[in-house]
Amino acid sequence: MSNYDWGYPNTVWFGNGRIKDLAKACKFLDIKKPLFVTDKDLAKTKMVEETLEINKRAKLPTIIFSDLKGNPLGSYVKKGVDVFKNGNHDGVIAFGGGSSLDVGKSIVLQAALNRPLWDCTDGGSFWIENDYVESMAKNRITNPDNVKPFIAVPTTAGTGSETSRAAAIINDETKVKKIVFHPRMLPTLTILDPELTVGMPAFLTATTGMDAFAHNLEAYCAPGYHPMADGIALEGMSLIKKWLAVAVNEGANLEARGHMITSSSMGATAFQKGLGAIHSLSHPVNSLFNVHHGLSNGIFMPYVLTFNRSAIEKKIAKLSEYLSLKEASFNSFVDWVLELKEQIKIPHTISESVKITDQDIEKMSPMALNDPCTPGNPKKPNLDDMVSMYEHSVQGKLF
């Protein structure tokens, strides 16, 4: 695939081997002493070693912060901010999956805020609620120059954190996964290099791909008028339909990898319109059981789809037509989702990934109901509905 530079929703440099332009990106943003944020496992790889060598050759002193892992905690951000400030760093490079990118952008934001990071969370869906202006006014950064440049380099194709203004961080004390949101969390520059995703195992390719699918799907189904988001989500799902299974089965296929990393960025661009109950159900499972976010999204997808049927049937029929499925119908789409999940080995029930008891459901259901993604669900759920969706996902029974 050829190299392309895009200007929406942020500056994006796309193409095979574009990681070689990392030092150029730092120079472009006037970063002279970057903090390199990645997870513990990735920090030990040759891929990170080779990436750091790019900056070394350009005489850019780059320090690694890797005290983090999947489903990131607020304490990771706090440690990162201390390292960032004590090292007098003037920018952040976040390299890795969604967890690394979310921690990286949170470090940049928290370092510039004179208030806790949690003040920029929840309060209703920032995408569709009327308190957006009030929330942002409360958390306005007095001196925008304090927000240092942030370069996002994804090595997975799922979260789309590289093109979003949000981060998912778990509060250490409450064990609740919170959505941190601020306009200044949008990465200053993103490098989309398909070659960096080639090393993903098949199952991780599948689960991150389902995360991208969930972002595009829930953005498309979210209530409200946002034809730009709808258009991006439609094409994102079209790419996923054509290329996800290929990427899973042919890991070295750079064309498939390129389209999947693009669809991931598209999903995060589109979900400024909203997300829904797929994510609401996932977040408690992620924070309490450390289940991979993309995996839980893939598991919950058909249950939420069929729960929402009365609110989205016509829209899903149009989506089925756009995707050239056998029939332009809701049932045809659900059947295809189930077939795709089976093809890429995504479990049908949550019980196949983690043992969930009735007591767990009782604990998680209020968390899901109060999740900031819930207001974006096309069919307004109550507590009993959340309980029911969890129970259906345990039993493998669609609505």
Predicted regions and their residues:
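Carboxylate- and glycine-rich phosphate/diphosphate-binding segment that chelates Mg2+/Mn2+
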Residues: 163-273, 384
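Gly/Pro-rich interdomain helix-loop hinge
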Residues: 288-363, 399
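Predominant activation on well-ordered alpha-helical scaffold segments within soluble catalytic domains
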Residues: 23, 52, 63, 78-81, ...
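Glycine-rich phosphate/pyrophosphate-binding beta-alpha loops
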Residues: 158, 266-297, 371-375
